[in-house]
Amino acid sequence: MSGMSICFAMREAVEWILHLDPVFMHVGPLEIRWYALSYVFGILFAHWHITKASQCLALDKKFLDSLMLWAVIGIILGGRTAYILLYNPSFYWEYPSEILQTWHGGMSMHGGYVGCIIAVSIVCKKHRVRVMPVLDLCACAAPLGLFLGRMANLVNGELYGRATTTCLGVVFPSSGDLVPRHPSQVYEAMLEGLLPLLFMSILARYTKVRLRFGVLSHMFGAWYGIVRCAVEFFREPDPQVGYIAFGWLTMGQVLSAPIAVVGIFMLVLTVLREKPREGVADISA
């Protein structure tokens, strides 16, 4: 099978997903959307993964249930607040009733990232548990949620890429033109979701990286920040924001660069300073 044939096959798969109905099913007057399901299954996977992986940390069920609840709240509040303030403040100032209508879309990954860290830190402090090993668990579970979320963006026909003449170019009806564009949602799903999920799972399972608390969480932050900055060059900027500067710098890059820098710095610092643990670790604060 030639490279061109593979390219066209990938495009056909993307187009098939793109033309799915954003509403998965109706239950009476209630619409169940693919986007909502991406959150549900991402949360369920995170709960399963964290519960299973936490056995080596001797974390009790009460703590884990509290952790999942507040992590989800932190992601939603952080993601929604950041989107409102950074991406579309004038719209929500004019239509404040839309603030609570999250099913209409409008979430920021960067806000969700910060919100989750804050929520996890608060829960850990309350239960007198060290933060970094718990964030490591969250970091290994997060990529699947990112993968599902980006694929749901594709179903919604949103966050599409810039114009391209390559064989991967797809026409997005929501763009308002017939110009083939990069399926940037798929790029992000693979590079921010599937690839780090596989890579970090291998590291956590088959290497001693997991014994150095903080390495996995800082690695995820560095990975996401770098990849997001790169993929933004293929993604059309949000129309209500446009380019921030230089005719190419986007809001996504402005927010991702600090995450990458801090992640790299903390990763190096952790590798140099954190001593590996053996067996069931005591992570009491």
Curated annotation (Swiss-Prot):
Transmembrane segments: 30-50, 67-87, 103-123, 129-149, 184-204, 213-233, 252-272
Principal location: membrane
Enzyme Commission (EC) number: 2.5.1.145
Pathway(s) it belongs to: Protein modification; lipoprotein biosynthesis (diacylglyceryl transfer)
UniProt xrefs under InterPro entries: Lgt (IPR001640)
NCBIfam families, alphabetized: lgt
Protein name as annotated: Phosphatidylglycerol--prolipoprotein diacylglyceryl transferase
Species name: Anaplasma marginale (strain Florida)
Lineage: Bacteria, Pseudomonadati, Pseudomonadota, Alphaproteobacteria, Rickettsiales
This protein's encoding gene: lgt
